[in-house]
Amino acid sequence: VLFGTGLADVVCPPITQDAVYNNLTCKKRREFFPGFGHEEIQAFDDMLLTFFDDAPVVPCPVSTPTAEYQTVTFVADDGATLSARYIRPVGNKRVPTVLMFHDAGRPVRGWHHMTRFVALGYAVFALENRAEADAQTQFADAQAAARAALSLPTTLNLIAWGEGLGGTLAIAAAAKQPQHVVKCAAQNPLCTGAYADCAQYAAQLICPLLMGTSGMDTIAPPDAQNVVYDAASCDKKRYIYVKYIHERINAFEDRVLAFFHPMV
């Protein structure tokens, strides 16, 4: 466990954190940050990248002459073990990595589907969402996935992409990793109820945003998606598909490929 403590934290005072840390019986390390309270600490995030270097990478029994297929496991903020599918071009060259998130109620995309990005010279790091997690846990898992992807030696930078819930997580990951995420694409992001924070994350984006909206979506209503898109002040573009519901849109996926790789 890597444990960080802001010495000016009044929400969870250092003395309270002492008890938690002292009760840990596993291998552990603690870092103190004078002058920081209960807030995000960039220096600690940077330490996490090194900490995640030990994330196990297991080869898969699938291969092609141009791509390597692997499963990466890493630890979530709450201690749970998370898994991601990782596909990268053969070799040790550092390449842009598509940080991919899937929708609620749908599985992670198939290996061969994601290989399309390898043809463009990109890697793919696709998180397998926890089925029963609440919104805040899902947001935290997205950040953990971004850190794990960044810890891989062949990652140059990140491109966030997702549909539905995945679109929301892509926007959140891009907002929280502005120095590493260079583009973000989201289709029908969930943006009401527990996911209303999506608009706040959109307002923090500095990378270009591509957004797709289904005109008949009742799960992520177009009016709610308007709030998300309007909140973004970055370079942005949106496509509206009037006759579609909350479903996969092949035409938008073509737009995503062109957005990520302008030569497509």
Label every model-predicted segment:
Residues V20, G167-Q179:
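Short glycine-enriched nucleophile-adjacent loop
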Residues R109-L127:
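Short amphipathic alpha-helix adjacent to the substrate-entry channel of hydrolases
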Residues R94-D103:
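Short beta-strand element of the alpha/beta-hydrolase
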Residues P153-G164:
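Alpha/beta-hydrolase fold nucleophile elbow
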Residues A133-L152:
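Alpha/beta-hydrolase active-site loop
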Residues F3-T5, L205, M211-T213:
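Short beta-strand/loop motif that positions the catalytic acidic residue
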Residues V57-N92:
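N-terminal cap/lid segment of alpha/beta-hydrolase-fold proteins
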Residues P14-C60, D223-V264:
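C-terminal catalytic histidine-bearing segment of alpha/beta-hydrolase fold enzymes
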